[in-house]
Amino acid sequence: MAMKSVAVLTKGMFGRIPAQLAVSSVPSNTIQKRSNYKFVGMPNETDGTLAGDLNYGLHNVFFTELFRGFGVMLGHVFMEPATINYPFEKGPLSSRFRGEHALRRYPSGEERCIACKLCEAICPAQAITIEAETRPDGSRRTTRYDIDMTKCIYCGLCQEACPVDAIVEGPNFEYSTETHEELLYNKEKLLLNGDRWEPELASNLQAEYLYR
């Protein structure tokens, strides 16, 4: 009964019972003074005083929240938009952006990958599979380089581990597919990505060389 009487005080000017009745039903040591509370901004309920009741009633009668929100809306009409019209407009990407994978070549056209398999070993998702063979000149090159893009978590560890900057994550993030098989990248697909994005890849690596 004591809790119910105190709660009635918060219902506003139209639902309150006389204060003396509520106080009489509650022990004096359980009553907290209204001065202990501070209403900030737009009040959602009355604070129990006559001024609070009047303020609460005016806000409900004249819909001040509605007009205040309308004013905020009008202010944003003349502000610069915070969004872009994607996909017709695209925002800038960081040089550290990690997108679709690619295998790079040297300017001579020779593949950079030396089949050290460091990327395969460090991949936490075990998404990379590499097979290699030794050439007559003693160098090693990959015969198979597969990445299961459905497993990849885009951590960038493969790129960090590569000693010759062969495997990188490029700027492309628009490569959604309709089938699972299209996300199983082989060596030819990765080299094609590298040829396509080489200018951007080289520029990004150069921009970040001090931090690698």
Swiss-Prot record:
Keyword terms, alphabetized: 4Fe-4S, Electron transport, Iron, Iron-sulfur, Metal-binding, Mitochondrion, NAD, Oxidoreductase, Repeat, Respiratory chain, Transit peptide, Translocase, Transport, Ubiquinone
SUPFAM superfamilies according to UniProt: 4Fe-4S ferredoxins
Catalytic activity: a ubiquinone + NADH + 5 H(+)(in) = a ubiquinol + NAD(+) + 4 H(+)(out)
Keyword Translocase: yes
UniProt keyword Glycosyltransferase, yes or no: no
Note accompanying the cofactor annotation: Binds 2 [4Fe-4S] cluster.
Gene Ontology cellular component list: mitochondrion; respiratory chain complex I
Amino-acid positions noted as binding [4Fe-4S] cluster 1 in the UniProt annotation, renumbered to this chain: C113, C116, C119, C162
Origin: domain of life: Eukaryota
Pfam families cross-referenced by the UniProt entry: Fer4_7
EC number(s) given by UniProt: 7.1.1.2
MF annotations from Gene Ontology: 4 iron, 4 sulfur cluster binding; metal ion binding; NADH dehydrogenase (ubiquinone) activity
Localization terms from the record: Mitochondrion
Cofactor: [4Fe-4S] cluster
Domain 4Fe-4S ferredoxin-type: 104-133, 143-172
InterPro entries per UniProt: 4Fe4S_Fe-S-bd, 4Fe4S_Fe_S_CS, NADH_quinone_OxRdtase_chainI
Residues engaged in binding [4Fe-4S] cluster 2: C123, C152, C155, C158
Gene3D superfamilies to which the protein is assigned, alphabetical: 3.30.70.3270
GO biological process: mitochondrial electron transport, NADH to ubiquinone; mitochondrial respiratory chain complex I assembly; response to xenobiotic stimulus
Function: Core subunit of the mitochondrial membrane respiratory chain NADH dehydrogenase (Complex I) that is believed to belong to the minimal assembly required for catalysis. Complex I functions in the transfer of electrons from NADH to the respiratory chain. The immediate electron acceptor for the enzyme is believed to be ubiquinone.
Family per similarity comment: Belongs to the complex I 23 kDa subunit family.
PANTHER family for the chain: NADH DEHYDROGENASE [UBIQUINONE] IRON-SULFUR PROTEIN 8, MITOCHONDRIAL, NADH DEHYDROGENASE UBIQUINONE IRON-SULFUR PROTEIN 8, MITOCHONDRIAL
Oligomeric and partner information: Complex I is composed of 45 different subunits This is a component of the iron-sulfur (IP) fragment of the enzyme.
UniProt protein name: Probable NADH dehydrogenase [ubiquinone] iron-sulfur protein 8, mitochondrial
Organism: Caenorhabditis elegans
Lineage: Eukaryota, Metazoa, Ecdysozoa, Nematoda, Chromadorea
